[in-house]
Amino acid sequence: MPKPLLEVHDLKKHFPVTRGIFSRTAGHVRAVDGVSLTLVEGETLGLVGESGCGKTTVGRTILRLIEATAGQVRFEGLDVFGLKRRELRTMRRRMQIIFQDPYSSLNPRMTVGGMISEAIRIHGLARGSGIRSRTAELLET
């Protein structure tokens, strides 16, 4: 069997519910409660469910855009929850979430080339004219 690319075990994300003038925690909303999955290279995973069931929260928690309440996530054998900021940034370049509504995921005021250029610049993959040439190269493929 191929080596797992992504392993998620018993992932949980609970959000506190606060009440009162002092914002006391009155309970928790269990947005994600015990998700486990394994993905090998070349596979594609689609999380499907009704609105509000936790699909986006699973993705954001795997990428550590929000912190998990409990569980384990391993990407290419590395413990994602144990990565330092710089290592996490490198890992995120290799992972992608495609949100369910492409109309709200893409900025209608930017061209596709502009979005690609922005990603290249943000991740420090090129500078100046290198950004333009790399963008053009990617648009040709």
Locations of the language-model features?
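ABC transporter nucleotide-binding domains
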Residues: 1-141
